[in-house]
C-alpha cells in the first residue's frame, strides 16, 4: 500500500512539474499586447478628429461644387423627421440616409466610390463623422459641408 501511495504522489508531482514547465514555456511564447492608443474622451473630440481628416466646404464652396459638378451627391444624414419638418438642400442628386444607417445603405445609393459626395447635417456635428466613415468605406471624393443646413436656410438658399 505504501508503494501505491508513493506512486500516486510521484505521479502527481510529475504532473505538476510538467504543467509548470509547460506554463513556463508558454510565457516565453506569449507576447504582451501593444500599448493601446489614447482614447478620445468626448464626442466633440471625435468630431474634431473627423473634421481634420475630411475636406471641408463652406456655403460658397458647396454652391460652386453644385454648379461645376452637377453629378455631386448631396447626402443629408439628419433623421427623416428633421428632413420632413424643415426640408433639405435642393440638389439634383440628393439622398437622406440617417447617420446610424449610413454604413448599411450607402452602397445601394452610391455604388461608384469615386462619385463626388458632400455630406451635411443640421449644424455639422454628425456630418463630419459620416464623411469620415465614407472615406473609411473607400469613398474617395467625400467632403463635409461645415456650415450645416441651419446656415444654408439662414442664407435663404434653395431648399425642397
Regions found by a protein language model. Give the residues of each.
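Rhodanese-like catalytic fold shared by cysteine-dependent sulfurtransferases
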Residues: 2, 8, 19, 23-71, ...
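Sec-dependent N-terminal signal peptides
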Residues: 7-14
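Structural scaffold elements adjacent to functional motifs in cytosolic proteins
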Residues: 74-76
Amino acid at each position: 500500500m505504501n508503494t501505491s501511495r508513493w506512486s500516486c504522489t510521484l505521479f502527481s508531482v510529475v504532473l505538476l512539474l510538467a504543467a509548470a514547465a509547460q506554463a513556463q514555456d508558454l510565457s516565453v511564447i506569449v507576447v504582451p499586447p501593444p500599448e493601446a492608443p489614447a482614447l478620445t474622451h468626448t464626442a466633440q473630440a471625435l468630431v474634431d478628429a473627423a473634421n481634420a481628416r475630411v475636406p471641408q466646404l463652406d456655403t460658397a464652396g458647396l454652391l460652386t461644387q453644385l454648379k461645376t459638378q452637377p453629378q455631386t451627391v448631396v447626402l443629408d444624414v439628419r433623421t427623416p423627421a428633421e428632413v420632413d419638418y424643415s426640408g433639405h438642400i435642393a440638389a439634383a442628386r440628393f439622398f437622406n440616409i440617417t447617420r446610424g444607417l449610413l454604413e448599411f445603405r450607402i452602397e445601394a445609393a452610391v455604388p461608384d466610390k469615386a462619385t463626388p459626395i458632400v455630406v451635411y447635417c443640421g449644424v455639422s456635428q454628425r456630418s463630419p463623422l459620416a464623411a469620415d466613415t465614407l472615406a473609411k468605406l473607400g469613398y474617395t471624393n467625400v467632403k463635409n459641408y461645415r456650415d450645416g443646413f441651419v446656415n444654408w436656410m439662414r442664407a435663404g438658399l434653395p431648399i425642397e
